[in-house]
């Protein structure tokens, strides 16, 4: 059995996130592999995977902030808001100045309401939006609040009648960079879509910790053990032996006065459970090492 932990993968272009999971199931010789947030097939970069019991904490990582580097093409709108869709509209964008582009980018920073791209995994009446679009159905998704902490222009260059804009983005979970490209183009009146996307960070995990799939195939290894990952992401509470046994059985403990989810550690340093305070007692978020294990 593979030891439990997290693997930070540098996903190559052309693979779905599920493809990467399938490859890592073979590499680590276990079915218990999952990911903490989908990357589009055209995108590259950070994909956080959980192996064995570490799959239990993946749901807590999906809400982490994300960082991206991307290229937006101004002057063309597409059916998918990225380069994989059909061009729906073309407008000569060569008149755009860097000042106009910077001003439009600034209008998309901070707390905004964003309409997700229709070709997305969001469910509409129990069905994925992208499947409805493929079936020829009209899909209207409601705007939802997201936060754009950084939306910075790193370079501009001509691309025929279009303008390619290299950007870096720090954003909340649930943000669609494709939708940012679409909305930037709309704000400038020329249309826009995403031509390249690389995720550089998910919460505490960045490209500097990422392995390529070929590296992992040659030498399977975790980026972090389960204990290392939990203590990197969450606060820590040290338990007595009796408390550790109780936590391993899912029983409540006295509250610790720690904000949010925290890792509850046995005297030997192993993380027994992730807990959170609710009033005067704790509530188990997930028991990682049950007392019966």
Curated annotation (Swiss-Prot):
Gene Ontology MF annotations: RNA binding; tRNA pseudouridine(55) synthase activity
The EC number(s) this enzyme carries: 5.4.99.25
Keyword match Isomerase: yes
Gene3D superfamilies reported for this sequence: Pseudouridine synthase, PUA domain
Keyword vocabulary terms for this entry: Isomerase, tRNA processing
Active-site residues from the entry: 40
Lineage: superkingdom: Bacteria
Entry keyword Secreted: no
Pfam families: TruB_C, TruB_C_2, TruB_N
GO-annotated biological processes: mRNA pseudouridine synthesis; tRNA pseudouridine synthesis
Catalysed reaction equations from the record: uridine(55) in tRNA = pseudouridine(55) in tRNA
InterPro entries linked to this entry: PsdUridine_synth_cat_dom_sf, PsdUridine_synth_N, PUA-like_sf, PUA_sf, tRNA_psdUridine_synth_fam2_C, tRNA_psdUridine_synth_TruB, TruB_C
HAMAP family: TruB_bact
NCBIfam families per the UniProt record, alphabetical: TruB (TIGR00431)
Function as written in the Swiss-Prot or TrEMBL entry: Responsible for synthesis of pseudouridine from uracil-55 in the psi GC loop of transfer RNAs.
UniProt family annotation: Belongs to the pseudouridine synthase TruB family. Type 1 subfamily.
PANTHER family to which the protein is assigned, alphabetical: PSEUDOURIDYLATE SYNTHASE TRUB1, TRNA-PSEUDOURIDINE SYNTHASE
Protein name per UniProt: tRNA pseudouridine synthase B
Species name: Mycolicibacterium paratuberculosis (strain ATCC BAA-968 / K-10)
